[in-house]
Amino acid sequence: MLSKVDIRQVIKQRNKCLSKAEREAQSAAILAHLANHPRFKAAQTVMLFSSLPDEVNTHAFIRQWTQTKRIVLPVVKGDDMELRLFTTEEDMHIGAFGISEPIGLAFDKLDEIDLIIVPGMAFDKEGHRLGRGKGYYDRFLSQPNIMSTYKIGICLPHQLVESIPTEAHDIMMNEVIG
């Protein structure tokens, strides 16, 4: 089994081989699958993420669904994440790590979140996730009032791997779309 460091290196190399057009086509297919997922259809409040260039491109998807669903996005605050309600592109700024973040008030009604969509460097078929190594999502998702919320990891097909080494603090996904 490859180490977490080795898997990250492999994924970074695979990312370099993917054209922008391929990434956009794959993103569209993954997000179409998500949009038709029964859990997404039923959800009123969805935690999504503002994508980085090497992730499933979520920007248009967020704008598309903000009219019919309450969309909340993570914002990095020191060593932790908090959520903010997405309203419009105009109410976004570039935050930590170059991530586009909402500038509005914090959303603290975590028990109202119906579905959590999670990015990752890699996922395996069992639902194990490999992040970027800072632990933001693992810390956030370990909060008691969202531990049982359904979590779907989304990634590009080349980010699906056979197996990811896990540690006790790693939070599993209920499902992975990639």
Question: Which residues are covered by each model-predicted region?
Answer:
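Conserved phosphate- and dinucleotide-binding cores of soluble alpha/beta proteins
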Residues: 82-178
